[in-house]
Amino acid sequence: MSTDFVLLPEPQQSIRLDGDFEVAAGGSISVGARPSASLHRAARKLQEALSMVGQRWQLTPAGAETDADVRASIAINPYHVPRAQGYRITIEPDFLGIVAADDAGAFYAAATMRQIAEQFQGTGRLPCLRINDWPDFLTRGVMHDISKDKIPTLETIFGLVDMLAGLKVNQFQLHSENAFAYRDHKIVWADGTPVTGDDILALDEFCRERHVDLVANQNSFGHFERWFEHDEYKPLAESPEG
């Protein structure tokens, strides 16, 4: 099988090992002791990634008896992976192991496995390798301006956040001038399709599940044209006549 694949961003260390790892029927994935909800989500993402390559494996608690052959594991151990948000992936012919520094690291490991799986989809096998990865910058953000022309739907924003999280972006700034439905300032957004408070709450939960901090970014007086065009707000302008 071809062993060429691309990872974005590139891991700090990536070494190709001899052999292949078969994702055959009857396997299972061990999930670390006392797992958080976040680790469970990372384990499910790993499960989905392996399913793209071969068979779907069940998730089992670490140390639990199971009829399935434990062929993979995902766990958190900051002693083995000391750098925040870091992770280690080891794929050998008979086992796939993931160890992460924290919940975020486990999520990023699963995201890396997803990228690998997409490039070996349907082959039934993965190349053996060892990856050690951690961020150079603990905060990695993207600002998205939703005030220019069409305001995106919540589903579109969800899709963007999901893609960015898969690329290990962990801060998402939603930049707005008149795109938020302020309760006491309806005249500013009444003719549009603004993002509502309920939308923001749903987006915040969606972001948190992907280890992304949602940051509000509201234009202020220097970029308030769509506010100052209304008589109620013109007194706030330094040059009300433009």
Region locations from a protein language model:
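Substrate-binding cleft of carbohydrate-active enzyme catalytic domains
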Residues: 137-242
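Contiguous, structured surface segment used for ligand recognition
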Residues: 1-140
